[in-house]
Amino acid sequence: MTTLFVLDVPENIPVVDVAGTDPSVTIGKIGPYFEITSDGTIVIDRRATGCRHAVWYSCLAGIADARIVQHDKDALRLEPP
């Protein structure tokens, strides 16, 4: 399962909210982190989050069973390995 971890701080909430709009994505919590999971690809559009670049590039705390195929000014895309 493709998994993305995002620290639970106010600046990162829009990232989690946008990820959660995909019906194939599940949002959970592990300690101080949001756990964003999907059986397939996870795509988060930066402009939809409203995040500035500094927050956008620092929101990624970790991944599991995934590989990052895009992390630029437009989107974050994780795919299963």
Over which residues does each language-model region extend?
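Short low-complexity stretches enriched in small and charged residues
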Residues: 1-2, 33-34
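Short, surface-exposed ligand-recognition loops at beta-strand->loop->(often short) alpha-helix junctions
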Residues: 2-11
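Short, conserved beta-strand edge motifs with alternating hydrophobic and charged residues
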Residues: 5, 27-30
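A common structural junction motif
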Residues: 22-26, 55
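Helix-rich interaction surfaces within compact, conserved domain-sized segments
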Residues: 30-33, 39-81
